[in-house]
Amino acid sequence: MRLVVCLVFLAPFALVCHGQVYKGGYTRPIPRPPPFVRPLPGGPIGPYNGCPVSCRGISFSQARSCCSRLGRCCHVGKGYSG
């Protein structure tokens, strides 16, 4: 009987305390900023995007990354599209 009385008394208190965590401004850990993007070979960096201005001299993986992230895709003999 005492256990039931204790649980009935403590349950609302626990819910109120648990709710205060969220009302008190608890936030997740702040994510780290992305590492500094170094210039890729083949030309200067385009503004704020991390992809070279020219398709020359970049690896296949770099070209694929620019294409999938930013829609700037290299085409043979044509350079970037998009």
UniProtKB/Swiss-Prot annotation:
Record keywords: Amidation, Antibiotic, Antimicrobial, Chitin-binding, Disulfide bond, Fungicide, Pyrrolidone carboxylic acid, Signal
Signal peptide bounds: 1-19
Q: Which InterPro entries match?
A: Penaeidin (IPR009226)
**GO annotation terms (biological process):** defense response to bacterium; defense response to fungus; killing of cells of another organism
In Gene Ontology terms, what is one molecular function of this protein?
chitin binding
Is Disulfide bond set as a keyword in this record?
yes
Q: Where in the cell is it found?
A: Cytoplasmic granule
- Per the record, residues carrying Pyrrolidone carboxylic acid are Q20
Is this entry keyworded Transmembrane helix? Answer: no
Annotated function:
Antibacterial and antifungal activity. Presents chitin-binding activity.
Q: What family is this protein classified in? A: Belongs to the penaeidin family.
The protein in question is named: Penaeidin-3e
| Source organism of the structure | Penaeus vannamei
